[in-house]
Amino acid sequence: MTWVSLFYVSSQDFEGDIKSLKTVFSQFEKQIHQKDGYRFSPEAEFAMGWYFYTIYVKIGFIKKLVEYNHIRDPKVKDEKAILKIVQNYLKIQKSKSRIKFDRDKPTLRGYYHWLLR
C-alpha cells in the first residue's frame, strides 16, 4: 500500500503530543484490526518554539477507518470526521498543538459516494 501524507501537526510539546497522537492512532488500529497503518515523518522541523511534522497513513487504513465510523455514524463521509476526533482528543489532553490536513482537499473527498451505494 502507498503512504500518503494526511495530517500536518504544529506542536509546542513534542514529546507529550507525540504520545497523545500515538495513543489515538493506536486506538484507530485496534478499531479496524490493522497494524502499521500510520507513521510519523522521520524528522520534525523546529522553528520559533514550534515543532512541525507530518502524519502519514496507508490509503487502506484511512478507508477502513472511515467505513468503520460511517457504520457507527452515517454522517461520517470522509476523513474530516477523523480529523475532528483527533482534534477533540488533543483538546481533552489540554494540548496546544494544531493539526490540519496536509493539503487543501481531503484524500477521500469523493469516497463517501461508494459508501452510500
Where do the model's predicted regions map?
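Short, extreme N-terminal segment that most often corresponds to the first beta-strand
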Residues: M1-V24
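A structural detector for beta-sheet-dominated domains
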Residues: F7-S10, Y56-K58, D102
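Short, flexible N-terminal segments of the mature chain
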Residues: I18-S41
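Residues marking helix boundaries in flexible regions
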Residues: K19, H33, G60-K63, L83, ...
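Extended Gly/Ser/Thr-rich low-complexity repeat segments
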Residues: K22-V24, K64-I85
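A common structural junction motif
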Residues: E29-H33, I71-A81, L90-K96
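Short, intrinsically disordered low-complexity segments
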Residues: H33-P74
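Amphipathic alpha-helical binding modules
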Residues: K80-R117
